[in-house]
Design a protein with these regions (language model features):
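Aromatic/acidic polysaccharide-binding cleft in carbohydrate-active enzymes
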Residues: 288-400
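Substrate-binding cleft and catalytic face of glycoside hydrolase catalytic domains
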Residues: 81-244, 250-253
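N-terminal carbohydrate-binding accessory modules
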Residues: 21-88, 100, 115-123, 203-206
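Bacterial Sec-dependent N-terminal signal peptides
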Residues: 1-23
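Carbohydrate-binding surface patches
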Residues: 389-450, 492
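C-terminal beta-strand-rich structural cap/linker in extracellular carbohydrate-active enzymes
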Residues: 465-504
Length: 504
């Protein structure tokens, strides 16, 4: 998506005012992938999902990880990939699974996945890790594993990467090196060592595929000191040009709470490579709580709060010009492969169990379909800012908004490249997503907004609603909305032309 860099912190201080007739939908959230969202507006349709074949490009990536360790089964979920609408999928190539005998690569399992994905219109983002125990000190095969260190292991690694790129360079254009080198209490993978591994791997990829886009770093949580040391090595060796982006994974309970931390990471990277992008390379929320299932276990999650979290993360990243990858397509059986995670990881968009079967799509699958259907490269981000004064003069093209609450809202705006019609994303961003559809009616005024026929869209359910003439008006450069239901899941106020719909 063609966008402009802007970090938006949205805090206004006008009195809280729940308007008469505010929606208080206290229905329990539906499980089983269905939404019970209801408001007082007239529903006129639903967001029409789009297949990846119908989308040229977008900001999104989808996690299809752990296939190299048989924690999930691609055959079980492959039919769900195209209809989701996210073109790029993250895969791990699995050195240890592919080279079980020295010098012999069995590509059959990976060929099957990559060939099928490409045939479906998907674009693999392929990671070269993990290590391989058939060589001395060649690293481990799981999350938190040490990287290869011995000369023999590094030579074998080089051969592996070269063989991998030669085989898939006509089908894979995006690559990644090593997953979460700083995970947990890992002290083996120093930033300097991992920087050197990233450089040697990227040089092999670029030699064989000069047009390749390579993601570096891929750290498991934002550690600014680790990142600084990593970037410094690459910069001092003059190798930053090898990398398209630096990836990070930062799991936080409130998906809107870490924008400041990402901005700090951006400032560190800017010291060394201001043109290298950041990519949020892995994130997602569980669909129920409990420790031992990976990150974010200490919360009573539901399918509804998972759907809110994932879509807030996606749209929050989009609003800050950060590419976003969501983990993952299906629940993963981590316990089967000696991972530090000992239970089923339930961050999947599809429910699974210990047999790795695909049982059904969760609510988050459908909610992310709605995001993918609307937000593609036909839109560009607008630098929208809050204002207290709706009568203040604006520069040409400047867009501002006002809200009748001192509660914090996330508000981002986008404009169609050709028609210049606009869509605004809005949600309450103060807290961890809850398990309720309860909304609060709010008044919103947009200055210089370009919307002729406004509709209200609930991203979670996909419902598209008419905003009646009694609830909106144009007054000069002001577009004024009254009694708009807002909650902690994303809603849109959009020009109707930007929302592909289907009948109920």
């Amino acid at each position: 998506m063609k966008t402009y860099w802007f970090i938006l912190f949205v805090f206004a201080s006008i009195s809280v005012s729940a308007q008469p007739g505010a929606t208080t939908n206290n229905q329990p959230p539906a499980e089983g992938g269905k939404s019970t969202f209801t408001i007082g507006l007239k529903q006129v349709g639903s967001v029409k999902p789009r297949n990846v074949r119908d989308i040229e490009a977008s900001n999104w990536l989808l996690g299809c990880e752990t296939l190299d360790r048989d924690m999930a089964d691609y055959e079980q979920y492959k039919e769900y990939l195209g209809p989701l609408g996210i073109k790029r999928i993250r895969l791990q190539a699995g050195w240890a699974k592919t080279e079980k005998v020295r010098g012999q690569y069995d590509w059959a399992w990976l060929d099957r996945i990559i060939n099928d994905a490409v045939q479906r219109g998907l674009e693999p983002w392929l990671e070269t890790s993990y290590g391989n125990p058939i060589y001395p000190k060649a690293g481990g095969i799981n999350l938190g594993a040490g990287a290869p260190t011995s000369p023999e292991a590094l030579a074998a690694w080089d051969r592996w990467v070269e063989a991998l790129v030669k085989r898939y360079k006509d089908k894979v254009n995006e690559w990644e090196v090593w997953n979460e080198p700083n995970f947990g209490d890992n002290t083996i993978n120093s930033p300097e060592m991992i920087a050197d591994l990233n450089i040697r791997t990227a040089e092999i990829i670029k030699r064989l595929q000069p047009s390749a886009k390579i993601s570096g770093l891929s750290m498991g949580h934002i550690d600014l000191d680790y990142a600084d040391a990593f970037f410094k090595v690459i910069h001092e060796k003059g190798k930053m040009k090898l990398f398209d982006n630096m990836a990070y994974h930062d799991y936080v309970y409130n998906p809107d709470a870490n924008h400041w931390h990402v901005a700090e990471l951006r400032r560190v990277l800017d010291k060394y490579a201001p043109t290298v992008k950041l990519r949020q390379g892995e994130n997602g929320a569980p669909s129920f709580g409990g420790f031992g299932r990976g990150a974010l276990g200490d919360w009573e999650w539901s399918e509804l709060s998972q759907a809110k979290w994932n879509t807030r993360r996606m749209l929050g990243n989009l609003g800050h010009d950060i590419e976003c990858s969501i983990l993952g397509i299906i629940d993963m059986n981590y316990a089967s492969a000696g991972s530090p995670i000992k239970k089923l990881n339930v961050k999947g968009l599809i429910e699974s169990d210990s047999t790795r079967r695909a049982i059904r799509p969760k609510l988050a699958y459908h909610a992310m379909q709605h995001v993918a259907a609307i937000f593609d490269n036909s839109l560009r981000r607008l630098p929208v800012r809050p204002t207290y004064n709706v009568n203040a003069p604006l520069a040409p093209g400047e867009v501002k908004y006002n809200k009748n609450t001192d509660r914090s809202l996330a508000v981002y705006g986008y404009e169609h490249n050709n028609s210049k019609k606009q869509v605004y994303t809005i949600w309450m961003d103060e807290c961890i997503p809850n398990n309720s559809y309860q909304t609060r009616d709010m008044n919103l005024t947009f200055l210089n907004a370009n919307i002729d026929q406004p509709v209200y869209v609930d991203i979670i359910s996909g419902g598209v609603y008419e905003i009646p003439a009694s609830q909106w008006k144009k007054d000069g450069n002001k577009l004024i909305f009254q009694n708009i239901p807002v909650y902690d899941g994303p809603i849109l106020i959009a020009d109707k032309s930007l929302i592909g719909t289907r009948n109920q």
